[in-house]
């Protein structure tokens, strides 16, 4: 049974509009990830945007709980139901139906469509919600309805705002399978399993804690797909269901080990984490040192450590991507389009971590011998900083030993060394916290952007706010103006804001707060609420922005055409004199690729294609082939822009014909983070300025070279540099003394000059069997390097032993390794010990 489809079809038959799953990266500065089904509708519940039509929605929302307040990462693999990635089925009513219908719908679906036995079902309600208690008695015996307090049956979004009692449906998995002291309704056991939560949003909580009835109560429900699938299939763990077992079976096949539930935590961790990794990568999140990308890295590295426990010593997670796409690509079709890209990103990240995991685990195990209760914060920091072990990975390993890590010391070291910190998730909402935008929205509704059609207009001032976003009736200083109709485009979708004039005041910026367009004006003549003013944009700036914005669409199309359909937009910036476009791709672009992309964009410009703008429902737009961006939030009808072969959803301003863009030049290509590249480019006047500057630079180079033929001048200089390098190398070359023991040439020596790696390579090339360790001191900095050729001795172990004597550390490959040291007084001791180690090995 396809429960996902059955649920959506059921509620569609009840007048609900099916809403596609929103992005995992939410349009909400307070959240790291979308972690519940109601997140996409939060602005409707809080009144920030008007109720939709129809006022009934249903969805299957993908969710991540692996960072921030809602974090299930530590429990995954060790319980039957915790996941970092899950799907939440939900039905929502925005001031339409309420408790009676919500309860009736839930009961009908559970008993008639899922056909769960009624004698296995129980219900909870809030202890003061007599209405819900009485309504449930129409469907289920009174004895099966339990009352609980706020802790279990009251839901609220935050300290203030919409809230209300909730009612939960439970499924009894059977006394014969669960008989612990906590296996009762309301207990912490697993016998009675919550499958559906119905939230009755009927109150508004004020700052002083007072609850006031909402004029139009709403419904928010959530049912976990993984949980209900397991119940329907008669499984006691989500991981034993058809949503996970194909992945677990593939893991078992790859590691050649049989999965047994009681000892299979590592299988479950990997199965869960590959789902999270696939969906996050598919939606544009990339491996990074901070923020969402760091959470993704933590998830994958935790899975890799569990893979190490199963015997995986090479990259393997990327081999599981096909199974996930086979399981879920039917509903989430974008997974199939991104499959090859996802596999490559996971493989590269695996190889990055696997190159250090063995050394890291060795250090962890050494410190474990000295640990009684608390693991050293210094060692935990070293594992993080040198070997890429996130702190929670170290904590996870310690948890298996019933130990804890000294987190306080770890954090102290992080701060002292200004190490990489997790991203600070503060958005535009912080700088406007004092502004009562909700009040403005309720008073005036959304003001209207007329800038698509008009460059100037007469408009009424609805509200004025000072620089601290406090409402004022008059404004002489700099501040914010809310016009009834505004021609000024607010910063959105990467496009920078319009500037211009309002009355005699210069408009410097326009931003959108709670769907209100507010323009920031310089100090000047007094403005009053109710004034009719003339508003005029800077048309020259708007035109240049439009040219650069349209060019990003052509660039996006060219990238997908030349590099592959895995390419998707990961960010953009559009200004009047430049554009910046971030996109998903696993490696730097070659010179040939950049030339082809630049050429393709200019071809599309020269084709002189008319811009076609259409408004249509989101699903119709997607079916037409229009590209929708994962980090954008779409509601109702959407605006579709067609420029030649490019077709995207976009609310920005654009040229009427591609020929207006002029010339397109790529200025720079660079990496942003793992799996994300960036192209910076210019068009139109900025392109002419770029070419002019390039020609001026070339002229300066000719003058410096004193040669009009730049290439021959550079070639001559390179030959001179090479000659000087060879002279320097020969002058600093040190003759290395060595001795032969049992056919192995050995050199252990301190040197002062020369290229230490080149000297080791030269030494190894001279002999069939060789071991060499060199210690070099420059500016009181100690560098060690070792090389081994056809001898049963590891260079990494040899150099590490010597480095530890010198108060340092290091390592590397079996045939070549480097390290650093600190204590100059112990160089002779390190040399002596290294020689003894080599002789013993032979």
UniProtKB/Swiss-Prot annotation:
Query: What does the UniProt function comment say about this protein?
Result: Catalyzes the attachment of alanine to tRNA(Ala) in a two-step reaction: alanine is first activated by ATP to form Ala-AMP and then transferred to the acceptor end of tRNA(Ala). Also edits incorrectly charged Ser-tRNA(Ala) and Gly-tRNA(Ala) via its editing domain.
- GO annotation, biological process: alanyl-tRNA aminoacylation; negative regulation of DNA-templated transcription
> Which Pfam families does the record match to this protein?
DHHA1, tRNA-synt_2c, tRNA_SAD
Per the entry, the cofactor note is: Binds 1 zinc ion per subunit.
Its ancestry begins with: Bacteria, Pseudomonadati, Campylobacterota, Epsilonproteobacteria, Campylobacterales
Q: Which cofactor does it need?
A: Zn(2+)
EC primary class: ligase
Asked if the record carries the keyword Endoplasmic reticulum, the reply is no
Give the domain section of the comments. Consists of three domains; the N-terminal catalytic domain, the editing domain and the C-terminal C-Ala domain. The editing domain removes incorrectly charged amino acids, while the C-Ala domain, along with tRNA(Ala), serves as a bridge to cooperatively bring together the editing and aminoacylation centers thus stimulating deacylation of misacylated tRNAs.
Q: Any idea which GO molecular function terms this record carries? A: alanine-tRNA ligase activity; aminoacyl-tRNA deacylase activity; ATP binding; tRNA binding; zinc ion binding
Please tell me one Gene Ontology term that the record gives under cellular component. cytosol
Question: Which keywords, in A-to-Z order, does the entry hold?
Answer: Aminoacyl-tRNA synthetase, ATP-binding, Cytoplasm, Ligase, Metal-binding, Nucleotide-binding, Protein biosynthesis, RNA-binding, tRNA-binding, Zinc
Entry's EC annotation? 6.1.1.7
Q: Which family does it belong to?
A: Belongs to the class-II aminoacyl-tRNA synthetase family.
Tell me what organism the protein belongs to: Campylobacter jejuni subsp. jejuni serotype O:6 (strain 81116 / NCTC 11828)
Q: Where does Zn(2+) bind?
A: 549, 553, 650, 654
The record lists the catalysed reaction(s) as: tRNA(Ala) + L-alanine + ATP = L-alanyl-tRNA(Ala) + AMP + diphosphate
Where mainly located? cytoplasm
For this entry, the protein name equals Alanine--tRNA ligase
By its UniProt entry, which InterPro entries does this protein fall under? aa-tRNA-synth_II/BPL/LPL, Ala-tRNA-lgiase_IIc, Ala-tRNA-ligase_IIc_anticod-bd, Ala-tRNA-synth_IIc_core, Ala-tRNA-synth_IIc_N, Ala-tRNA_ligase, Ala_tRNA_ligase_euk/bac, DHHA1_dom
**Any idea where this protein resides?**
Cytoplasm
């Amino acid at each position: 049974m396809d429960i996902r489809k059955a649920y959506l079809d059921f509620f569609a038959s009840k007048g609900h509009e099916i809403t596609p799953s929103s992005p995992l990266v939410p349009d909400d500065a307070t959240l790291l990830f979308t972690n519940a089904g109601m997140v996409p509708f939060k602005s409707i519940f809080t009144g920030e945007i008007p109720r939709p039509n129809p006022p009934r929605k249903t969805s299957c929302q993908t969710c991540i709980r692996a960072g921030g307040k809602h974090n299930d990462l530590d429990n995954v693999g060790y319980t039957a139901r915790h996941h970092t990635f899950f799907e939440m089925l939900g039905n929502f009513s925005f001031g339409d139906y309420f408790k009676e219908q919500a309860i009736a719908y839930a009961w009908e679906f559970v008993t008639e469509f899922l056909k769960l036995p009624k004698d296995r079902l129980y219900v909870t309600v809030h202890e003061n919600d007599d209405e819900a208690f009485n309504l449930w008695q129409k469907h289920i015996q009174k004895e099966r309805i339990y009352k609980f307090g706020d802790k279990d049956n009251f839901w609220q979004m935050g300290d203030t705002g919409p809230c209300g009692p909730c009612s939960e449906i439970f499924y009894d998995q059977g006394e014969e399978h669960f008989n612990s002291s906590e296996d009762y309704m309301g207990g912490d056991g697993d016998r009675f399993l919550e499958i559906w939560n119905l939230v009755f949003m009927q109150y508004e909580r004020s700052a002083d804690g007072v609850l006031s009835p909402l004029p139009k109560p709403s419904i928010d429900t959530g049912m976990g797909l993984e949980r209900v699938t397991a119940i329907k299939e008669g499984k006691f763990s989500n991981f034993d269901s058809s949503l996970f077992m194909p992945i677990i079976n593939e893991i078992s096949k790859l590691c050649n080990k049989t999965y047994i539930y009681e000892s299979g935590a590592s299988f479950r961790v990997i199965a869960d984490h590959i789902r999270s990794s696939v969906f996050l990568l598919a939606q544009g999140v990339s491996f990074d040192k901070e923020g969402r990308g760091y959470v993704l890295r933590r998830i994958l590295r935790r899975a890799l450590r569990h893979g190490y426990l199963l015997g995986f010593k090479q990259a393997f997670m990327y081999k599981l991507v096909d199974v996930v796409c086979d399981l879920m690509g039917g509903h989430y079709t974008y997974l199939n389009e991104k499959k090859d890209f996802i596999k490559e990103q996971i493989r590269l990240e695996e190889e990055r971590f696997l190159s250090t995991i063995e050394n890291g685990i060795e250090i962890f195990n050494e410190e474990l011998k000295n640990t009684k209760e608390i693991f050293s914060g210094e060692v935990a920091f070293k594992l993080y900083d040198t070997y890429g072990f996130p702190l929670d990975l170290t904590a996870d390993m310690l948890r298996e030993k019933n130990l804890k890590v000294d987190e306080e010391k770890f954090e102290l070291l992080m701060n002292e060394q200004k190490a990489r910190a997790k991203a600070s998730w503060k958005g535009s909402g912080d700088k406007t916290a004092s502004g009562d935008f909700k009040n403005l929205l309720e008073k005036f509704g959304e003001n209207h952007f007329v800038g698509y059609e008009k460059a100037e207009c007469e408009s009424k001032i609805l509200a004025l706010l000072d620089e601290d976003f406090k409402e004022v009736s008059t404004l002489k200083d700099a501040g914010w103006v809310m016009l009834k109709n505004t021609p000024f485009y607010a910063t959105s979708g990467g496009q920078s804001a319009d500037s211009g004039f309002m009355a005699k005041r210069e408009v410097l910026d326009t931003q959108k707060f709670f769907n209100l367009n507010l323009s920031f004006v310089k100090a000047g003549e007094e403005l009053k609420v109710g004034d009719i003013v003339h508003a005029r944009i800077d048309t020259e700036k708007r035109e240049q922005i439009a040219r650069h914005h349209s060019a990003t669409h052509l660039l996006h199309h060219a990238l997908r055409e030349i590099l592959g359909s895995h390419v998707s937009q990961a960010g953009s910036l559009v200004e009047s004199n430049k554009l910046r476009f971030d996109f998903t791709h696993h490696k730097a672009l070659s010179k040939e690729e950049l030339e082809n992309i630049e050429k393709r964009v200019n071809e599309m410009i020269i084709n002189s294609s008319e811009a076609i703008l259409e408004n249509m429902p989101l699903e119709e737009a997607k079916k037409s082939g229009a590209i929708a961006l994962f980090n954008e939030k779409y509601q109702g009808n959407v605006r579709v822009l067609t420029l030649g072969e490019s077709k995207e959803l976009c609310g920005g301003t654009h040229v009427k014909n591609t020929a207006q863009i002029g010339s397109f030049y790529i200025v720079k290509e660079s990496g942003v983070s793992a799996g994300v590249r960036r192209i910076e480019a210019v068009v139109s006047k900025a392109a002419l300025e770029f070419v002019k500057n390039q020609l001026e630079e070339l002229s300066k180079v000719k003058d410096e070279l004193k040669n009009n033929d730049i290439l021959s001048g550079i070639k001559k200089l390179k030959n001179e540099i090479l000659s000087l390098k060879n002279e320097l190398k020969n002058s600093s070359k040190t003759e290395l003394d060595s001795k032969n023991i049992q056919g192995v040439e050995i050199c252990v020596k301190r040197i002062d000059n020369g290229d230490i790696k080149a000297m080791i390579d030269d030494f190894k090339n001279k002999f069939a069997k060789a071991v060499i360790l060199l210690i070099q001191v420059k500016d009181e900095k100690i560098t060690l390097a070792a090389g081994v050729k056809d001898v049963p001795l590891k260079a990494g172990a040899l150099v590490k032993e010597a480095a530890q004597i010198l108060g340092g550390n290091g390592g590397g490959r079996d045939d070549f390794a480097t390290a650093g040291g600190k204590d100059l007084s112990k160089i002779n001791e390190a040399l002596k010990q290294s020689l003894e180690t080599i002789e013993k090995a032979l």
